[in-house]
């Protein structure tokens, strides 16, 4: 419990596959003896390029003339599934990118990823959700996964209707105003843009098709 205080889960873990010798300290075996630097975001609110681990590494690389590992670019396959996206408020959202992934199975993330998410104070959920949080922490780019089977007729980026309600992932219901920007389908808002997703389209153990925002 002291190693993973932010997790509500309790389970027995078989450590045989890790291959370390008996007597190895648990923190060393599970790579939990690293150093964590906590940087107060108030000191760099004007530097969004530093809002991720890679940005901090790039800054340190520039200051101390150290080598910086490159991030490999990924080109999606040409046969990506078609999914309609419409932006109705281009002033507040000039660009929206999403890709549909089909026939997936929701599994637990690899232990290394879970461990890294734990260590920065977040809670692992499953591989699909964890990878979006992992990318956000690494690159400072928030992403989100929608259950595609619960999205009706594509994605629309629009202003919320006055007093429109949205049930968030954390169980809270918001009463929105026309100043709020939402991600919506043809029926209702499904996420508060740039803030939090809604419960309607959340990824569950039964999810097999997703929209990666």
Question: What spans do the regions from the language model cover?
Answer:
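Structured core elements
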Residues: 36-40, 52, 59, 98-100, ...
């Amino acid at each position: 419990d002291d190693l993973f205080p932010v997790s509500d889960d309790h389970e027995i873990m078989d450590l045989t596959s890790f291959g370390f010798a008996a007597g190895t300290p648990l923190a060393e075996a599970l790579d939990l003896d690293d150093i964590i630097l906590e940087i107060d975001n108030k000191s760099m609110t004007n530097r969004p390029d530093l809002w991720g681990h890679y940005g901090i590494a790039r800054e340190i690389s520039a200051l101390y003339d150290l080598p910086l590992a490159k991030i490999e670019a990924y080109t999606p396959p040409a046969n990506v599934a078609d999914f309609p996206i419409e932006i109705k408020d281009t002033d507040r959202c000039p660009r929206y990118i999403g890709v549909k992934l089909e026939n997936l199975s929701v599994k637990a993330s690899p232990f290394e990823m879970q461990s890294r998410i734990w260590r920065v104070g977040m809670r692992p959920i499953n591989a699909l959700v964890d990878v979006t949080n992992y990318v956000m922490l690494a690159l400072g780019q928030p992403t989100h996964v929608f259950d595609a089977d619960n999205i009706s007729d594509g994605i629309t980026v629009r202003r919320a209707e006055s007093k429109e309600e949205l049930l968030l992932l954390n169980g809270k219901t918001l009463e929105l105003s026309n100043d709020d920007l939402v991600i919506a389908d043809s029926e209702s808002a499904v996420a508060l843009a740039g803030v939090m997703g809604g419960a309607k389209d959340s990824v569950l153990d039964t999810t097999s098709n997703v929209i990666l925002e």
